[in-house]
């Protein structure tokens, strides 16, 4: 079987699971074509649970490369329901897996970003490391997520923000669900969501809980020509966090540059993670409403910072990274304080339920 990838390349037909697993067990890297072949078999429903689990564990134990993850992403896109949203778009998302059970910072940030006038196409799913996932909270806020791909695009045009529910746009991932659940461990699959937005956005802010995977994610985005900020809190959060210092991988013009970041450098205090702790979807939705109504505190500060990260990815402006983030924090704060962010959510609710 040939695997036709989105960039037009074909993989070599004569491959086998032993031909991939044995090199991985010897610590040898695979090519993008080889991992694309494996993912194509998985997403076609032609791989057994044992083959899926063996591949996922062997790849993670060996340590993924940019080429290997790129191959997985290409195959996922080949099986995805992709969409085209006109104009410049941005996404903000975390990989999950930090086990911190925080409120939905990236989801609230997406609404704030839309309030600044940027067009947001968020890609998300049920809970990974938050107490509830982005989709759970958005449904509690009144956003209708049960939309066809065409309606998802229409909502983006009408409201300036839309949501791609992963299970609807990547239905072939169901073939890996049983093996992933039975493994119960973090594998490469956990970082593929942020790399496979169905709208193929070109600007992203991506939080990565796994320190080893953050530069890999940045490398994949760089190879695609995306503009992005990839980050990880030094305490393990998949956010540009206010609970600690962070590492940031700035992706621009095909180049990745790693920088340290301290929230105190933009005037934000370091707070305990308990200040960002969430609960169920109803609680987290209420936190979002209070944020949009102008409530001050640690949640607002974290949302402003992460909103700023996405705005920098979309349009960095001038100066150092710290200066860029400081400038965008002011833009995000104005979106909340003027009521524009709350209006963006109201437009989203109305458009998605029309």
Swiss-Prot record:
EC number: 2.4.2.18
Pathway listed: Amino-acid biosynthesis; L-tryptophan biosynthesis; L-tryptophan from chorismate: step 2/5
Gene Ontology, cellular component aspect: cytosol
Catalysis performed (reactions): N-(5-phospho-beta-D-ribosyl)anthranilate + diphosphate = 5-phospho-alpha-D-ribose 1-diphosphate + anthranilate
Cofactor binding comment, as recorded: Binds 2 magnesium ions per monomer.
Binding site for 5-phospho-alpha-D-ribose 1-diphosphate: 94, 97-98, 102, 104-107, 122-130, 134
Residues involved in anthranilate 1 binding: 94, 125
Cysteine disulfide partners in this protein: none
Binding site for Mg(2+) 1: 106, 239
Gene Ontology molecular functions: anthranilate phosphoribosyltransferase activity; magnesium ion binding
InterPro entries: Anthranilate_Pribosyl_Tfrase, Glycosyl_Trfase_fam3, Glycosyl_Trfase_fam3_N_dom, Glycosyl_Trfase_fam3_N_dom_sf, Nuc_phospho_transferase
Binding site for Mg(2+) 2: 238-239
SUPFAM superfamilies: Nucleoside phosphorylase/phosphoribosyltransferase catalytic domain, Nucleoside phosphorylase/phosphoribosyltransferase N-terminal domain
GO biological process: L-tryptophan biosynthetic process
Keyword terms, alphabetized: Amino-acid biosynthesis, Aromatic amino acid biosynthesis, Glycosyltransferase, Magnesium, Metal-binding, Transferase, Tryptophan biosynthesis
Cofactor(s) needed for function: Mg(2+)
Root EC class: transferase
Binding site for anthranilate 2: 180
NCBIfam families (alphabetical): trpD
Self-association and partners: Homodimer.
Functional note: Catalyzes the transfer of the phosphoribosyl group of 5-phosphorylribose-1-pyrophosphate (PRPP) to anthranilate to yield N-(5'-phosphoribosyl)-anthranilate (PRA).
Annotated family: Belongs to the anthranilate phosphoribosyltransferase family.
Protein name: Anthranilate phosphoribosyltransferase
């Amino acid at each position: 079987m040939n695997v036709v990838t989105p960039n037009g390349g074909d993989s070599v037909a004569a491959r086998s699971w032993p031909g991939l697993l044995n090199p991985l067990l010897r610590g040898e890297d695979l090519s993008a074509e080889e991992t694309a072949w494996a993912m194509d078999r998985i997403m076609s429903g032609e791989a057994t649970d044992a083959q899926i689990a063996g591949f996922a564990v062997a790849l993670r134990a060996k340590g993924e490369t940019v080429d290997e993850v790129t191959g997985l992403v290409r195959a996922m896109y080949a099986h995805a329901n992709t969409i085209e949203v006109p104009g410049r778009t941005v996404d903000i998302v975390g990989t999950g897996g930090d086990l911190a059970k925080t409120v939905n910072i990236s989801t609230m940030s997406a609404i704030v970003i839309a309030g600044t006038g940027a067009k947001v196409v968020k890609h998300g799913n049920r809970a990974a490391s938050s107490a509830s996932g982005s989709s759970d909270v958005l449904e509690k806020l009144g956003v209708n997520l049960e939309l066809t791909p065409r309606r998802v695009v229409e909502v983006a045009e009408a409201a300036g923000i839309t949501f791609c529910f992963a299970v609807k746009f990547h239905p072939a991932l169901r073939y890996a669900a049983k093996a992933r659940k039975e493994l119960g461990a973090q594998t490469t699959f956990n970082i593929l969501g942020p790399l496979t937005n169905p709208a193929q956005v070109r600007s992203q802010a991506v939080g990565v809980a796994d320190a080893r995977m953050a530069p890999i994610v940045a490398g994949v985005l760089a190879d695609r020509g995306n503009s992005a900020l990839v980050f990880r809190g030094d305490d393990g959060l998949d956010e540009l966090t206010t609970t600690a210092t962070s590492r940031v991988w700035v992706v621009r013009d095909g180049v990745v540059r790693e920088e340290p970041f301290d929230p105190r450098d933009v005037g934000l205090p370091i707070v305990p993670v308990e200040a960002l702790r969430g609960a169920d979807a109803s609680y987290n939705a209420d936190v979002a409403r209070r944020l949009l109504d102008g409530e001050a505190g640690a949640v607002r500060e974290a949302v402003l910072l992460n909103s700023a990260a996405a705005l920098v990815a979309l349009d960095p402006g001038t100066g150092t990274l710290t200066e860029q983030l400081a400038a965008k924090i002011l833009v995000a704060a104005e979106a909340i304080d003027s009521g524009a962010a709350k209006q963006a959510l109201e437009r989203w609710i109305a458009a998605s339920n029309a």
